[in-house]
Amino acid sequence: MRFLQIVSMIPGFVLVYPQVASIEVYEEVFPRLLLWIPAFTILMAATWLAGVAVVVRLLSVMIRPGFYSSHSAVAAAVWLTHVIMQRTLISAYPIYASGFTPAWLRLLGARIGKNVEISTVETIPHLTWIRDNSFLADHSSASTTRHSSHWVHIGTTVIGERSFVGNSGIVGPDQDVPDDSLIAVLSTNPGQVDAGSSWLGQNPHQIPRRVVDSDSTATYEPTRKLRILRGIVECCRIIPQMFSNLLDLLTIWVLTIIYMQFWFSDLSQAEALAWTSLLAWPVPVSYTHL
């Protein structure tokens, strides 16, 4: 993962470096770099996502449904896929629980239908099919693997049309959720069940359903206006990452000023180093507590 993080910054450096390479005075470098933070952030995020997609796709070649030894290469590929997907939930959180999530999972290899809402789902993408108008809530899991001390069970999952998997709901390997069904919060899929049923609990039992009429333009079929407004709001999710990069740059800027003021002064090298260390110390300390 560290390797992918480093690689994701390379295109941004390639873009920005020519803009400051000819500047000889450091006071002029940082203001120029500030102007490039938005472009650098977007390019870094896009490169990171592309790198994750490539790695997950490559690992998917090894991962096929079945039972495998816990010490096999397939088990290692499954483990690495889970690690990458979990890290992505943190590093690429702005694209989760948004209109971009279905496209992101398609890029990773999942089959995603129309008008699907997906939050922070954990899954093995290429083994998952989420059909039209379905909803997967926060921390839901699909095509999850089963483990013992000696084997790992890998299987596919299909979420039927207009079905709902609640918060932390689990749909295991080789299990499908039929159309118009509900797996409630903190519940598991009971296996082969009838369409239109609802299930609750870790040892799931069926619960009654209440018929409610609602406007489909506010749920399954939002208007174009709602889609556009949602897209505008969700595009703003990258702004906090831009501010994070801004703080990184400002920290380096302040440390550079302190270094240049004392290191090239009339003080001895020992005195300059002592003053530089003394004055620079509060900067990273205060930054880490923001």
Role assignments for model-derived ranges:
Residues L105-L107, R111-Q206:
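Structural signal for interior beta-strand "rungs" in well-ordered beta-sheet cores
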